[in-house]
A protein has these predicted regions:
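C-terminal, loop-rich substrate-recognition/catalytic regions characterized by aromatic stacking residues
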Residues: 75, 327-375, 512-536
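Active-site rim elements
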Residues: 100-104, 184-189, 250-255, 318-319, ...
Length: 536
């Protein structure tokens, strides 16, 4: 996609992002604005006011950052602190491979910080809390890329938090099979444990900001959404949140122990390492870069630095856990975009994407029975258009569409609640259509970000979506009555049920519920079975 974006614009974005970092200092005198100070367990933090929104940046949610001997160790809880600290600048972004955007990040292993946004003024009523978890294929991403200011201006009756977590080889790395790896039995799912520690901090401190610790919704897109659908399955996590908003990500974004070990061994071979002690001598940037070159999101090796179905934190069978009711007490709003894979088509270009898709499909066909192989081939044969289109559609079914419907099915069958959507507005950029992540800027109320959409979607439409998301966070139901709807019209969003299978079609000028079987989001006969396989 880099050829679609003006280099001058990229440089402006990089410069802007870098300006958001800085050192938050300890305040040793009494010369600070007390109205902007919030006392938390691990210190008093002083924010900055931007219009009518108070922003707190770079608050540590751990007692010690995961550096030195704490690399590949579970996050350390905070300790009480009576100090007063600035919360003016973003903390460091986790180590990750360099790309167009990530090259702007100030990276480091000391990366476990969070940001809080709240409206100015006090309220007698505790406000619902929304916690954002960023995406990036579990390999990239950071809180600095997401500014909730405009979202908060429109929705001052909630509080928003964005939490950082370790990604890539430093966040998801199996080490316990190594000769000196027995003390690193959590390394395979550290990114998720970081998220839980961040949620624990929110639970213990958000009341001081005016938030309700018993009404927390976790919200993510892509790998952030995958995180949000995995966190309910980790023992002890559900006390920190009650709702999930998951955009374009599902719990199938995981790997087996065997795949995780293969990933570790390949990185060690590339670095010439034999033990954890050897790996400890390699700096974080080198580790991230090496893993990114081997398993980056655009590679076709079929193994990724994803969360591991380790049987310790995540169940070995994710879908069985959902079917057995592991998340039935958590309310879900989730879905995806109708042309998810078009974003990757736009990145690669048709020729490279076609070759990538062919390799990807052949790699996964090897896992299937002969009957299943013929079902997939039949599905591909029925798709017309350009040579890349069969791969575009079937991989979209594998990674996005079918898992979303499976999530609705299992959650509903177990007695839980699922509100499901399909986002349909299209980008004006070549090949993009309604591709992966084109909706994010609209939901953040950021009209200046058209990098993926190529345009601003209808203003009223954006307001309706944001109101639905906030209404779900408040009440557990995204439906809008006419008196609170931005266009004065009521929108009744039905729960997914096993008979009607209704989803909310988020058309730009016609938001309406529709039976999944009418919309044909998933091919029940030829592609739904793909969800029985974990495809990293």
């Amino acid at each position: 996609m880099s050829d679609m974006i003006n280099s001058d614009e990229v440089n402006k974005v990089i410069e802007m992002i870098r300006s958001l970092y800085g050192e938050n200092k300890c305040i040793t005198d009494d010369n600070y604005d007390k109205s902007l100070a919030v006392k938390c367990v691990n210190g008093t933090f002083v924010g900055k006011k931007n219009e009518n929104i108070i922003e707190y940046k770079g608050i540590p949610f751990v007692g010690k950052q995961p550096v030195g001997d704490l690399r590949w160790k579970a996050p350390v809880d905070v300790v009480p602190d009576d100090g007063v600290y600035e919360a003016f600048y973003n903390g460091k972004t986790p180590c990750q491979p360099m790309g167009d955007l990530s090259s702007a990040y100030v990276q480091g292993e000391d990366c476990l910080y969070l940001n809080v946004w709240k409206a100015e003024g006090d309220s007698d009523k505790k406000k619902p809390v929304i916690v954002w978890i960023y995406g990036g294929a579990f390999e990239t991403g950071g809180t600095v890329a997401y500014d909730m200011h405009n979202f908060m201006k429109e929705n001052p009756d909630v509080i928003v938090v964005a939490i950082g977590y370790r990604v890539g080889f430093l966040g998801f790395c199996h080490l316990s099979h190594l000769s000196d790896g027995k003390d690193f039995s959590d390394a395979q799912n550290l990114g998720l444990l970081d998220q839980i520690m961040g949620l624990k901090w929110v639970h213990e401190n958000i009341a001081a900001f005016g938030g309700d610790p018993d009404n927390v919704t976790i919200w993510g897109e892509s790998a952030g959404a995958g995180s949000c659908t995995l966190l309910p399955l980790i023992e002890g996590s559900q006390k920190y949140f009650k709702r999930v908003i998951a955009q374009s990500g599902a719990p199938g974004q995981t790997r087996s122990e065997e795949q995780a070990i293969e990933c570790t061994d390949k990185v060690m071979e590339a670095l010439g390492c034999k033990t954890v002690a050897d790996l400890m001598k390699v700096d974080g940037e080198k580790l991230a870069t090496t893993a990114g070159e081997l398993f980056g999101m655009y590679q076709v090796l079929g193994i990724r630095t994803f969360p591991e179905r380790d049987g310790k934190y995540l169940p070995e069978d994710i879908w069985a856990a959902y079917a057995n009711g592991a998340a039935k007490n958590i309310e879900f709003l989730h879905g995806c975009n109708k042309d998810e894979m078009n974003a990757f088509l736009a990145v690669f270009g048709p020729e490279v994407f076609t070759e990538w898709g062919k390799n990807r499909l052949e790699e996964n066909l090897a896992k299937f029975t002969d009957e299943q192989k013929e079902l997939v081939k039949s599905y591909c044969r029925d798709i017309g258009g350009e040579s890349y289109e069969p791969y575009n559609r079937v991989i979209g079914q594998m990674l996005f569409l079918a898992p979303q419907i499976r999530l609705s099915e299992e959650q509903t069958r177990a007695g839980g609640k699922s509100y499901t959507y399909l986002f349909t507005p299209e980008s004006t950029l070549p090949l993009m259509k309604s591709g992966h992540a084109v909706e994010v800027a609209t939901l953040f109320n950021d009209p200046n970000d058209t990098a993926l959409s190529g345009r601003n979607f209808d203003e009223t439409y954006g307001k309706i979506l944001r109101k639905m998301w906030v209404q779900f966070a408040k009440t557990g139901n995204p439906s809008l009555t006419a008196d609170i709807s931005p266009d004065g019209k009521a929108y009744e969003w039905p729960l997914y049920d096993l008979e009607d299978k209704k989803v909310m079609v988020l058309d730009e000028f016609d938001i309406h519920p529709e039976k999944e079987t009418q919309r044909k989001i998933v091919d029940w006969d030829r592609t739904y079975f793909l969800t029985d396989y974990y495809i990293p």
